[in-house]
Amino acid sequence: MCGISGIYNLKRNDPISGEILDRMLEAIAHRGPDGKQVMVFDRIGLGFNRLSFLDLKGGMQPLLNEDRDVVMVCNGEIYNYRELREELMAKGHVFTTKTDVEVCLHLYEEVGEEFPKKLNG
């Protein structure tokens, strides 16, 4: 199971500390020995310790969509990701990894908060 950390800042003026996210990930480093990444935006910071099963060289998270306006982290296994990926690619979505969880990002773009209903996993 991967490790996920996050900070959401309610105060627009206060910067989010990447250092704090790094320390959070260090505390759960045993959850993901295959890589670590932190992304900091205006009001949110996300961190991820990766435990790789699919797309061993790619697939680092957090993941961004094509327009870079949706970001996500996910720890899970999506059994029907191949079918969903084909459907989404037919609709014009561009995938940057071969991971199963990237379908969640693009499904969210398609159907919004109802996307989990389409997942088998």
Please describe what each predicted stretch is.
Residues 1-121:
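N-terminus-centric sequence/structural signature that marks the extreme N-terminus
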